[in-house]
């Protein structure tokens, strides 16, 4: 199932079937192009455990929302993937924010969908904290190979 079907309020397009929240069909040549006013896409993958402090990203999103009120920044769609013990806690915390410029979705992505999502992102955020201070998160190392 497509993410736009699971999250139509965030990722859905126009009623014409020729656009999404991010793209539209160029009427002149039929090519697909990015919408000028599309939201930016931020992607992060987390295991929702204490060694990946989502609180840092949550604080950054709150600040971004505040800045959107005083300067022309794009709306933001945050795609935060993963499963783990603190996921529902943060889902409730996000829901309570009632952000106007930020929408957060928390899908589970199949392995074949993950590189497609990363390729669509404007920004990727890694929340992993290294115990040694010098290693890369395993997912980054896997995708680099």
Predicted regions and their residues:
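Conserved donor-binding/catalytic core segment of Leloir-type glycosyltransferases
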Residues: 11-15, 27-52, 58-63, 79
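Nucleotide-sugar-dependent
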Residues: 52, 110-117, 122-145
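C-terminal, well-structured subdomains that either form a transmembrane helix-short loop-helix hairpin
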Residues: 57-58, 120
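Nucleotide-activated donor-binding/catalytic signature segment of Leloir-type glycosyltransferases, i.e.
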Residues: 68-82, 87-116
């Amino acid at each position: 199932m497509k993410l736009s079907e699971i999250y139509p309020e965030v990722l859905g397009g126009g009623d014409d079937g020729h656009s999404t929240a991010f793209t539209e069909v160029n009427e002149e040549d039929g090519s697909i192009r990015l919408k000028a006013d599309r939201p930016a896409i931020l992607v992060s993958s987390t295991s929702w455990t204490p060694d990946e402090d989502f609180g840092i990203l949550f604080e950054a999103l709150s600040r971004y929302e505040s800045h959107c009120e005083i300067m022309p920044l794009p709306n933001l769609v945050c795609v935060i993937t993963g499963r783990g013990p603190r996921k529902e806690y943060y889902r409730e915390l996000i829901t309570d924010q009632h952000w106007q410029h930020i929408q957060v979705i928390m899908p589970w992505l199949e392995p074949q969908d993950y590189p497609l999502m990363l390729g669509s992102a404007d920004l990727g955020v890694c929340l992993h904290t290294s115990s040694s201070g010098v290693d890369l998160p395993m997912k980054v190392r896997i995708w680099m190979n």
